[in-house]
Amino acid sequence: RVGLYSKRGRSRIEAARSALRDAGFHGQSDADLRAARTFAMAEPDGSDARKAADELDFYAASGARDFLFHAEEHELSPAELADMTEALGLRVLGLELTHSDAASLYRQRFPDDPAMADLRRWDAIEAEHPDIFRHMCQFWCVSSGV
């Protein structure tokens, strides 16, 4: 099982991070983290900082610190994941879908792929629906030789 953050899916979080950094928050102490969350909640609906409050992790200190002030995070597109799995000789078995519309969107667009395991096709879906892997892109793979 592999889980990675999606570039498109995390764009709203990156915007929130940037807004909080610009406001002077760094999340290095509990007090700074609480102040950053208070600031975000006081911002107008729809603002970049306020969008952080749409995430469940926002409401727990460890989760908020991780998603808002993570020291180093690598984000990839499903197409980049496809390149990586192919280069490593891996075959994708399937994805763990958390977005309620993900499976129906894929099946409507690609009815010939009942396994829904083509990362390049998922990239096309995500291009149209950037929040589909908002939390994480998780998938199962095996060696191509198996």
Give, region by region, the residue ranges found by the protein language model:
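Conserved class I S-adenosyl-L-methionine
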Residues: R1-R50
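Rossmann-like AdoMet/SAM-dependent catalytic core
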Residues: L33-V146
